């Protein structure tokens, strides 16, 4: 809800990864560049929502901006595998019908999130991997880039630092941050989610994290919410974070929705004349935040770290993270705001 208690016409929430993100580790130039990139992503997505466009178009547009910025671990700027390769993952989901598309191990597509959407809309499948995903991307005519486009000096430095450690420290799920994502509510009351990542620095053996897995790193359902996650993917997979948050929201308010549905008159054939939508209901302020925090507590109890962004059909936009910081931002008709560090407060 907005500060005046009214449901916003639309809302967009984005993230650029969660992790050990502290002021002491960030130069003023890096801080400014990341905030500017987050604001550009919000601008791209919110322009679509403000003119009545779909939440699906908005999350794709926002994520594409972040994929094109080398500060983030997605698209250009993706981290290296242990063998010095780029393997990118992405997923997208439409809350109207729970259609979804996902890709993993992509090596040349400029914007993996757009490839995930093509999988959803132009193939009979949900999830494509590696050579098959690359082939499908080419067949769809999506822009392709050479390896050098994705590789940056900073990501190369991170890989060399990892390789210099004892072999027992070559795999650390907590080294992953910079994954990007977006969730949105449009003026029709529909939600959508999108997530894109280069994965984990030094990953081996075709490792797949939570980002391309529907229900772990991405989920959207008009009956509950839309979620995009970032962090230690192994733990997010084990908890099923994105689906768990949506399921808990849906379950908590199911009785309220069912009670409202019972008051709807039936037609001559005994069927309801219309279906009650979650966006038509007013639910307690803070409930989505409470649920997201609870699921992130479960991740922490298992030993995992990271964060989530959530948007609900009734207009809530929340963050929850158990790390020192998370690159994040949100927009609504009331305006745009971005933040990086854990102690920054934002208008909701």
Segments predicted by a language model, with ranges:
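Alpha/propeptide regions of enzymes that mature by internal proteolysis
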Residues: 2-348
């Amino acid at each position: 809800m907005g500060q005046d208690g009214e449901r916003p016409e639309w809302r967009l929430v984005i993230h650029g990864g969660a992790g050990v993100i502290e002021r002491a580790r960030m130069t003023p130039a890096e801080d400014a560049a990341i905030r500017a990139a987050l604001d550009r992503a919000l601008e791209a997505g919110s322009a679509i929502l403000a003119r009545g466009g779909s939440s699906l178009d908005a999350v794709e547009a926002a994520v594409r901006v972040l994929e094109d910025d080398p500060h983030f671990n997605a698209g250009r700027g993706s981290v290296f595998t242990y063998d010095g390769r780029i393997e990118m993952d992405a997923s997208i989901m439409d809350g109207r019908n729970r259609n979804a598309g996902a890709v993993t191990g992509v090596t040349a597509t400029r914007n993996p999130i757009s490839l995930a959407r093509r999988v959803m809309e132009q193939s009979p499948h949900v999830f494509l991997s590696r050579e098959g995903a690359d082939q499908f991307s080419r067949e769809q005519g999506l822009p392709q880039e050479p390896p050098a486009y994705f590789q940056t000096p900073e990501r190369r430095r991170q890989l060399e630092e990892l390789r210099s450690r004892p072999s027992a420290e070559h795999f650390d799920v907590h080294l992953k941050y910079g994954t990007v994502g977006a969730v949105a509510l449009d003026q029709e009351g529909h939600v959508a989610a999108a997530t894109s990542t280069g994965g984990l620095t030094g990953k081996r053996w075709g490792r797949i994290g939570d980002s391309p897995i529907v229900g772990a790193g991405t989920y959207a359902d008009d009956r509950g919410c839309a979620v995009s996650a970032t962090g230690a993917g192994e733990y997010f997979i084990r908890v099923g974070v994105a689906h768990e948050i949506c399921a808990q929201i849906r379950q908590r308010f199911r009785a309220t929705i069912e009670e409202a549905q019972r008051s709807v008159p039936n037609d001559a054939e005994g069927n309801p004349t219309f279906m009650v939508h979650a966006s038509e209901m007013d639910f307690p302020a803070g409930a989505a935040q409470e649920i997201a925090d609870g699921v992130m507590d479960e991740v922490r109890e298992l030993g995992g770290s990271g964060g989530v962004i959530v948007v609900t059909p009734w207009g809530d936009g929340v963050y929850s993270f158990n790390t020192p910081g998370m690159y994040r931002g949100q927009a609504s008709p009331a305006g745009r705001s971005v933040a990086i560090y854990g102690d920054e407060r934002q208008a909701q």
